[in-house]
Structures are given as structure tokens and as C-alpha cells.
Amino acid sequence: MSRQSLTKAHAKITELSWDPTFATPATRFGTDYTFEKAPKKDPLKQIMRSYFPMEEEKDNRVYGAMDGAIRGNMFRQVQQRWLEWQKLFLSIIPFPEISAARAMPMAIDAVPNPEIHNGLAVQMIDEVRHSTIQMNLKKLYMNNYIDPAGFDMTEKAFANNYAGTIGRQFGEGFITGDAITAANIYLTVVAETAFTNTLFVAMPDEAAANGDYLLPTVFHSVQSDESRHISNGYSILLMALADERNRPLLERDLRYAWWNNHCVVDAAIGTFIEYGTKDRRKDRESYAEMWRRWIYDDYYRSYLIPLEKYGLTIPHDLVEEAWKRITDKGYVHEVARFFATGWPVNYWRIDAMTDKDFEWFEHKYPGWYSKYGKWWEEYNRLAYPGRNKPIAFEEVGYQYPHRCWTCMVPALIREDMVVEKVDDQWRTYCSETCYWTDAVAFRSEYQGRPTPNMGRLTGFREWETLHHGKDLADIVSDLGYVRDDGKTLVGQPHLDLDDPKKMWTLDDVRGNTFQSPNVLLNEMSDAERNAHIAAYRAGGAVPA
């Protein structure tokens, strides 16, 4: 289609939009933003006629690659360590995709721009397609991988797992609260423009290095749609900037959106890339190096900083703090250790780091071994049942962490934990920004201005409180993380499937009572709580 005819077709489509004059349309998805002065343009002029043939070709390539992987015996070559982590990743990622599809009607309802509506409708179809091909990828892994246990329960496990529910919080952020906050700033301006770089570009590179060339095929097909989504987000952002009343809301939302994306996406993707790989070439980029290139340089410096020319205050401090958490404070390494600590309630297996892994980590992150090496050696020592408990219940110098109420990732950088009484409950937060998000941003008033559409962070946000006082075996059984024999756990702290004696069963984990740190915190006296918090922040043992 020629550019001229495309422009004419696009203009014709916008004529189909109309506003009723006989009644005031009901506002289904509310926003506190105003758009009376907004320019109405769609720079990409997206229309269905040119869209569908392109997507059909991409789908043909994806499904052709899936067929080729089976015929080419890819599953004889792929690393088990890598595919085990895909049980968690592929249980989570289709949900944010389908949530993004659900977010598009929110944006259409909130933004008075017929041109943008067309692009948002195209994006909705994109997101449904992304979720579909990811679900098909997961099914193919399940049908062909040596250990399908975990892949076969991902939709159920995602919803009741201590890690999966972090991903659920992330995806629900696209469809809850203020429509522009959720569907545009949080989803499109930050998540899609910044963090899909590590998600859909850096991670496929790691997959290929571990013998998995299906994930790169699928996720590069996804990423090739993101330029249109970025255009949608930028167009709505410029519309919002046209009205000075929106500036405080934009600055609020950029802080919240940036920090929550960092907390969740860097925790997950950083762990998958750093701890899910067997490729330990010294010239391979670490996650910190990838982050510097894909997010700090390509997003922050090229996209975010130029917004200052519109008078917008950019959260420079939060970008620098995120970088510091990754490089200096060991954020990704703390997340990996936390996931490994929780192996009995995982639906994927996590093997111990080896000497080769130690050498690579020490090369990329000097001082890594002194902080994490001994713990991973203990993890390896306690890998098999019979003589010990699961590592979470052994004395290995690791205190089970408090959960962040906002992002739901635990407060793993312990010196930064914030404890405050909010809504008559003592809550823990991983950082000052997560506390601000709960206590200030998601409230009915912001800087003296009513913000009734923001909503609140509510619900059972701490997985641990749901299982306080239960026996570990009962928790695993209730969650459904048991193999077909009715006794062997799906999660294991090793990759040895050949010897049944090395596989942990319900009987092996029975007798260990699980306790919620937050429940215990709220039961403490003021003096006990203060002492507990001080010890936790110091990284030491909790006083008796």
C-alpha cells in the first residue's frame, strides 16, 4: 500500500468515530488526567489492512520454527537449568501480555483521540497474539522436555506461588487504578519502552547460548511489535503534557512506574539470565552490563531525559538507585538466593551453582563469592534428603526475608527496608519509594488534588500470611506441587531425575512449620519490633 493511500485510509477510519449528542457517555475507566488541550495525532497511522499480512507472516515463522525444533531434536541439546527456569517465566509472562490487551479499552475510553484509538485497537490484537504464541511455546516445552512436571500446572501454580504472585501484581498494574497511570505510563511508557529490551532482546540471546532457539524466535516476534506500542504511549504522553494540570500526575506516575518495573522485572529477568544459564564465557555480558546498555543508555538517556525539555521532572534519583542496587547491592543475587531458599514450594527445579559459576560471578561482580559463595556451597551440601531439612529450615546464616507490601518482592536489600504502620497494619517495604507508592501515590488525594481514580493497594499481598503456622508438607500438598506418584515434590534443589532416592517427598519435608514474618512482626511489642528491625537491617541474626 502506498504511503498516500495509507494516509487516506487512516483518515477515513477516523471518520467512523462519533460522539453521541443525545446522552452523556458513561465513563467506564476513570482517569484524573485532562485532555482538553491535547493535540490529536497518530504518527504511525496504524491500520488493519497493512497490519494483518505482516502478523500472518510472523506467525508462520514462529510456528515453522516450533516444528523445526521438534524435527531437529532441540530438546536433546537444550540445558536443563535453562528450561527449568522457563517453568516460572512462561507461567508469568502470558498474564502481563493479556493484561496489556485488556488495558487498551481503558486507554481508548480515557483518551479523546480517534486516531490513537485505531492504534490502540491494533495493539490489543498484538497483545492477544503475544500471549497466544507464548502459551503455545510453553505447551511445546511441556510435551517435549524431559521433565514436564511444572509446565503442566503453570496456570494454577502462577496464581498461588510466592514468586508467581509477584508477576501477577506486575500484570494487574496494567489494568487497575487510574486508566492513564495503568494503561499508558506504567505499561507503555515504562514497561514496554524500557524493560522489554532486557525481556525480549537480552533474554533470547541467553536462551540461544543454552541451546534454546525457540524462545528467541517467539520473543523477537513479540519485540518487533513494540515500536508501534511505544509510539502509542509517546503520543498519549505528549497529549497529557499539553495540559499543565497533568504534570504533577505524570511525575508521580513516572516515579511509581519506573520503580515498580525495576523491582519486578529486574528481579525476574536478572535471575533468569544470570542463574538460569550454563554459558560462562568471560566475554558474555552480565545482567548489569546488559542493563547499562539496554535500559540506562537506550531508554533513560535517549528517551526519558529528553522529556525534560517539556518541563517534566525525570526521576534521575530512582534510575541511579536502580543501577546501584544491581551493581553494588547485589539485588539480582539476593533474588536468586531467595528463590532457591524457597525450592520446596517451587514448581521448577533449581540446581546449585558450581565452581565454574563461582568463577564467572567473581569475574563479573568482584566480591560475589565472599557474600554468596558459602551459601551456595551449603545449598549443594543440603541438596538431597535423608540427613537434613530443606535449606530454609537449616542454620546457614540466612534469615527468611520480609515481603514488600507494594512490589511484593521481599526486602532483600535489608539495610533499605522501611517499616511503617499504614491503614492500622505494620507493613514492610523494600525501599522508601515502595513505601511512598503505597502511602502517598495510591491514595484518593495527591498534593492537595483529588485523585479518586488511583485506588489503593489492598488484598492478601503477602504470600506468607496465607500459610502462617502450617506444616511445610501440607503447604506443598495444598498448592498442588506434587508429582503423579502423589508424594514426590515437583520442586527439587538439584537436577538429578535418575535416582528416586535423591528426590524429596512430602515425608521428607514434613515436620517443618512455616511462619510469616509479617504476622510475627505485628504480634511484637514496640521494643521487640524495634530490636527485630534493627537486627534485620544489619543483616544479622534476630534477637531471641
Curated annotation (Swiss-Prot):
<feature type="binding site">
    <location>
        <position position="130"/>
    </location>
    <ligand>
        <name>Fe cation 1</name>
    </ligand>
</feature>
<comment type="function">
    <text>Component of the propane 2-monooxygenase multicomponent enzyme system which is involved in the degradation of propane via the O2-dependent hydroxylation of propane. Also able to catalyze the oxidation the water contaminant N-nitrosodimethylamine (NDMA).</text>
</comment>
<comment type="subunit">
    <text>The propane 2-monooxygenase multicomponent enzyme system is composed of an electron transfer component and a monooxygenase component interacting with the effector protein PrmD. The electron transfer component is composed of a reductase (PrmB), and the monooxygenase component is formed by a large subunit (PrmA) and a small subunit (PrmC). Probably requires the presence of the chaperonin-like protein PrmG to ensure a productive folding, resulting of a soluble PrmA, which leads to the active form of PrmABCD.</text>
</comment>
<dbReference type="InterPro" id="IPR003430">
    <property type="entry name" value="Phenol_Hydrox"/>
</dbReference>
<comment type="similarity">
    <text>Belongs to the TmoA/XamoA family.</text>
</comment>
<dbReference type="GO" id="GO:0004497">
    <property type="term" value="F:monooxygenase activity"/>
</dbReference>
<dbReference type="InterPro" id="IPR012348">
    <property type="entry name" value="RNR-like"/>
</dbReference>
<feature type="binding site">
    <location>
        <position position="229"/>
    </location>
    <ligand>
        <name>Fe cation 2</name>
    </ligand>
</feature>
<protein>
    <recommendedName>
        <fullName>Propane 2-monooxygenase, hydroxylase component large subunit</fullName>
        <ecNumber>1.14.13.227</ecNumber>
    </recommendedName>
</protein>
<dbReference type="GO" id="GO:0046872">
    <property type="term" value="F:metal ion binding"/>
</dbReference>
<feature type="binding site">
    <location>
        <position position="226"/>
    </location>
    <ligand>
        <name>Fe cation 1</name>
    </ligand>
</feature>
<keyword id="KW-0520">NAD</keyword>
<dbReference type="Pfam" id="PF02332">
    <property type="entry name" value="Phenol_Hydrox"/>
</dbReference>
<feature type="binding site">
    <location>
        <position position="192"/>
    </location>
    <ligand>
        <name>Fe cation 2</name>
    </ligand>
</feature>
<feature type="binding site">
    <location>
        <position position="226"/>
    </location>
    <ligand>
        <name>Fe cation 2</name>
    </ligand>
</feature>
<feature type="binding site">
    <location>
        <position position="97"/>
    </location>
    <ligand>
        <name>Fe cation 1</name>
    </ligand>
</feature>
<keyword id="KW-0479">Metal-binding</keyword>
<feature type="binding site">
    <location>
        <position position="127"/>
    </location>
    <ligand>
        <name>Fe cation 1</name>
    </ligand>
</feature>
<keyword id="KW-0503">Monooxygenase</keyword>
<keyword id="KW-0560">Oxidoreductase</keyword>
<feature type="binding site">
    <location>
        <position position="127"/>
    </location>
    <ligand>
        <name>Fe cation 2</name>
    </ligand>
</feature>
<keyword id="KW-0408">Iron</keyword>
<dbReference type="InterPro" id="IPR009078">
    <property type="entry name" value="Ferritin-like_SF"/>
</dbReference>
